[in-house]
Amino acid sequence: MKRRKLTARNADINRLYEESVQCTVFEVSFINKLFKRYNKTKCKSLREDFCASALISSEWVRHNKDNIAIAVDLDRTMIKEAKNTALSRLSSEQQKRIKICYGDSSKFNTDKVDCILATNFSYFVFKQRKKLIDYFKHSYKQLKNRGIFMLDAFGGYEAHQLLEERTKHKNFTYVWDQSSFNPITHEIKCHIHFEFPDKTARKRAFTYEWRLWMLPEIQECLKEAGFTKVDVYMQGWNEKKNEETERFYKVTKCDADPAWVAYLAARK
């Protein structure tokens, strides 16, 4: 049966977001590797903050029959979406090992877990230092002893610029649009657009109003919140192919690249 062509009218923007932005197999593998490296044991329980469609949590319970996941988000529409998609993606046994909860990630209490995940720069929504530290303190309390809090961040001098970046996928083009940036406050406004072969588009399918936090600030706030050690992992570079690799390495120094993405691992 011929696959229907994607257009602005029939596209599911949540599925397009997942395909464009998220790489759950990598992130689940990365969590497992880091946790075992730090603690010499397996990571069993995961909490996914700002979970949206809870894609990582779903992959987590699929990955291992002993894994459990808790997914938290403040958007009721996305929580409903996450529950519906979990039903279609997971077996009945796997569904028993995932909890999808409506709540404020900075305040919502759950069972303590081995790892808390805040990715896709979601915590950038906290624009004041106190609010960011309050969220980090809450995350610290929600972790088991020797637990890990994993976050991502982006930067580089292009992060301060107004720009549009296009990435072509099989049936659509993903557009990352940095539409405004205030150097004084580091407030940044970004949009995600989707463009289709028939020349239609879903403009501003997603909009983000953040503070662009810098790595030293994030590390300082994590330590102020109580975390004993914070490591930074940067993506490797293949000199022959002149492109990024899929591996991330723990670093204390890196080049002043125009754009970069990093992971931070904060240990309790």
Enumerate the language-model features and the residues they cover.
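Conserved SAM-binding loop
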Residues: A82-K83
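Conserved class I S-adenosyl-L-methionine
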Residues: K42-A52
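A short glycine-rich, Lys/Arg-flanked "PGG" loop and its adjoining helix->strand segment in the class I
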Residues: K131-N145
